[in-house]
A protein has these predicted regions:
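Hydrophobic beta-strand positions that form the internal "hydrophobic ladder"
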Residues: 37-40, 101-103, 146-147
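A flexible loop/linker signature enriched in serine peptidases of the S9 family
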Residues: 1-8, 22-29, 43-70, 81-90, ...
Length: 242
């Protein structure tokens, strides 16, 4: 059963006439106009619009926390899945007015990454950001510039400007340098293993500062079996370095 149902209406600000786009639709979370106003970029679960975004095996139950994107044509009142074959979980998306591309913030394994999607053909590619966890981003309306800030396993937030044409990052402000000025952190390494059913479980381990491989240290094991992974951010409710 859906957690909620949502209705969407379009209000003509000149005549104040209301057009009902949909009523009490399940698994639909939000919508925004395309730059030309002819389509909607809709965020929801795979079960939205009668399940057209589902990509699961027969007998499996769809995960409503797996965020998906849809294009909704206002003339035909028909939706089409945009990220059905895209594995990461969609957190947020913006349809850029400058170049017509859709920029998607995703939960991708234990990373948070930005991807760009061409709505004309559905092709999705990763933006080469400089941090493991992108916290937030913003796009210029009239220039090929994306600003974002984020952090990684051993640094706090840094602010960058990203050239959409050249694909290059420019560090604007390093807050991490100020916050970690007097703090020593140990090394972080990836550590993956395969479960009994063959699934690769991705993990990592954190060494204490000034680690001596000839000494023995206590080990704390942290694991989480929920819908979202424990990501690689330095600053979280349970900072792994701490």
């Amino acid at each position: 059963l859906p957690h909620s149902r949502n209705s969407l209406y379009k209000l003509d600000l000149q005549t104040m006439a209301i057009d009902t786009i949909w009523e009490k639709a399940p698994y639909v979370n939000q919508a925004a106009f395309s730059p030309d106003g002819k389509q909607l970029l809709v965020a929801g679960a795979g079960d939205a619009f009668d399940g057209i975004g589902r990509n699961i095996k027969q007998g499996q139950i769809s995960n409503s926390y797996d965020g998906q994107l849809f294009l909704y044509d206002l003339a035909s009142r028909k939706a089409s899945p945009l990220t059905k074959d895209f594995n990461p979980n969609v957190i947020d998306a913006v349809w850029n007015r400058f170049n017509g591309q859709i920029y998607i913030l995703c939960e991708d394994e234990d990373y948070q990454r930005i991807y760009t999607c061409d709505p004309a053909n559905g092709k999705i590619k990763q933006v080469a950001a400089s941090e493991d966890i992108i916290m937030s981003y913003a796009l210029a309306d009239n220039a090929p510039v994306l600003f974002y800030y984020g952090q990684s396993a051993s640094n706090a937030n840094r602010l960058y400007a990203y050239d959409l044409k050249g694909g290059k990052n420019r560090l604007v402000y390093d807050l991490s340098q100020d916050k970690l000025k007097d703090i020593a952190l140990g090394e972080v390494h990836d550590w993956n293993f395969k479960s009994d059913d063959g699934t690769t479980i991705q993990g990592r381990y954190y060494l204490p500062p000034h680690f001596d491989p000839n000494k023995k240290y206590p080990m704390i094991v942290y694991y989480y079996g929920g819908t979202s992974p424990t990501n690689r951010a330095l600053e979280m409710r349970y900072s792994m370095h701490m």
